[in-house]
């Protein structure tokens, strides 16, 4: 990103796109590609995102689906078209991309060659919400608009739905992102490090044999609470040689108790994630035009009952957990909507509420969690 910012200021890039600055955004990848080897550019007819490339292979038709394009940091979120000034820096023009279509658009039928290979005929291919979080958020079993969502997996993505982009000095300072929603809405959200921390620790613990997530949670439950905290989003946790050592080093450098056992380390991670969610939810509430009364946790991480409970306690609001396979469910029901079987987003969410059994977790010991929040904030700021 820094090389790109030499050509256009970081603030200007954010103002034009509303997308969180991250080094893997398509804008920066294409910039680096051109600088390091531009031989492919003259040979390129169209640039397709991966979901659109798959659709092309199935149908022979090229499109650019809105939700995946919105994450590229090349799209104007107000006009929903590629920003020419950003493309020009990368020696590109809008005609290098296929036409932008909304989620739920019928791209076409399976091509003849695919039909021959598969034995399937007259099958429509739908442009689903190509960004997995957009599909997952569609599957949030919300009853009204006064909620935030947390798509919980290796990454935790916490946000709200907005009818319009929210791009201002606050969102820039907090590095919030404005990604496209499946219904053309905006998903104002923050990327947070999620289960990555526990996944990497689990690899270390399994050197001596298999360790289950249930065993990790049980060990954490048996450990003393609120002994040490980390900032889950600290760069030192991005790709350390040993996640356990990185967590211990963080605690050592901030003058805290140094966790040693599996339970102590896991508890440190879960409590710190819950407090990080509290932090981000507070920022979201300051940006939202409505009261956030509930947090919906969806995705694989929603199966972690301990973290769900910790999160409810930390935020002081009810948490509704599930469904765990939100991305797949949202994808399927969006196709049902395209086929005319389902009317709209509200009906999709009603179907999900009736088809699955989301678990509601009420907050407990809120004052105790509030007391220890300041200790988390001290070490969060310190590194």
How does the language model describe each region?
Residues 87-103:
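A conserved helix-loop-beta module that forms one wall/lid of the active-site cleft
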Residues 5-18, 22-23, 28-61, 74-76, ...:
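Active-site core segments that coordinate phosphate-bearing ligands/cofactors
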């Amino acid at each position: 990103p820094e090389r790109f910012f030499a050509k256009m200021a970081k603030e200007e890039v954010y103002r034009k796109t509303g997308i969180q600055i991250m080094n893997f955004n398509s804008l920066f990848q294409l910039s680096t590609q051109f600088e390091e080897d531009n031989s492919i550019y003259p040979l390129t007819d169209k640039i397709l995102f991966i979901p659109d490339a798959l659709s092309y292979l199935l149908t022979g038709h090229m499109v650019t689906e809105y939700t995946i394009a919105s994450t590229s940091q090349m799209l104007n979120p107000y006009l929903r078209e590629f920003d020419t000034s950003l493309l020009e820096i990368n020696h590109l023009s809008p005609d290098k991309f296929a036409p932008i279509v909304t989620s739920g658009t019928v791209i076409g039928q399976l091509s003849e060659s695919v039909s021959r290979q598969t034995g399937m005929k007259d099958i429509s291919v739908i442009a689903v919400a190509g960004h997995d979080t957009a599909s997952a958020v569609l599957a949030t079993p919300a009853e009204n608009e006064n909620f935030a969502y947390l798509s919980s997996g290796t990454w935790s993505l916490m946000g709200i739905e907005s009818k319009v982009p929210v791009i201002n000095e606050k969102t820039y300072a907090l590095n919030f992102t404005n990604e496209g929603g499946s219904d053309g809405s905006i998903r104002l959200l923050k990327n947070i490090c999620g289960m990555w921390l526990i996944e990497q620790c689990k690899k270390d613990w399994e050197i001596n044999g298999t360790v289950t997530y249930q065993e990790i949670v049980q060990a954490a439950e048996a450990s003393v609470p609120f002994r040490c905290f980390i900032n889950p989003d600290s760069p030192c946790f991005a790709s350390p040689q040993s996640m356990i050592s990185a967590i211990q080093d963080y605690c050592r450098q901030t003058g805290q108790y140094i966790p040693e056992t599996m339970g102590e380390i896991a508890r440190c991670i879960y409590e710190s994630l819950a407090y990080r969610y509290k932090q981000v939810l507070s920022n979201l509430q300051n940006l939202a035009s409505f009261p956030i009364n509930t947090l919906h946790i969806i995705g694989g991480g929603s199966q972690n009952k301990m973290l769900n409970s910790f999160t409810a306690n930390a935020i002081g609001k009810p948490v509704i957990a599930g469904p765990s396979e939100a991305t797949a469910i949202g994808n399927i029901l969006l196709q049902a909507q395209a086929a005319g079987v389902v009317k709209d987003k509200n009906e999709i969410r009603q179907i999900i509420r009736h088809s699955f059994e989301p678990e509601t977790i009420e907050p407990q010991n809120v004052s105790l969690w509030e007391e220890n929040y300041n200790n988390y904030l001290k070490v969060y700021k310190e590194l």
